[in-house]
């Protein structure tokens, strides 16, 4: 159960980080 939760958290972090990189890239930061 803990490993499954950890997996979902990791996916969420990577997904959020990817979107942040795209947004910052478009803003010229």
Curated annotation (Swiss-Prot):
Tell me the keywords, alphabetical order: Electron transport, Membrane, Photosynthesis, Thylakoid, Transmembrane, Transmembrane helix, Transport
Q: How does it sit in the membrane?
A: Single-pass membrane protein
**GO CC annotation:** cytochrome b6f complex; plasma membrane-derived thylakoid membrane
Which Pfam families does this one have? PetN
The principal location of this protein is membrane
Q: Name one GO biological process term.
A: cytochrome complex assembly
An MF annotation (GO) of this entry: electron transporter, transferring electrons within cytochrome b6/f complex of photosystem II activity
Specify the domain of life of the species encoding this protein: Bacteria
UniProt xrefs under NCBIfam families: PRK14747.1 (NF011331)
What protein family is recorded?
A: Belongs to the PetN family.
Designated name of the protein:
Cytochrome b6-f complex subunit 8
Which species? Nostoc punctiforme (strain ATCC 29133 / PCC 73102)
């Amino acid at each position: 159960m803990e490993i499954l939760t950890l997996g979902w958290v990791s996916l969420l972090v990577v997904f959020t980080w990817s979107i942040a990189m795209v947004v910052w890239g478009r803003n010229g930061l």
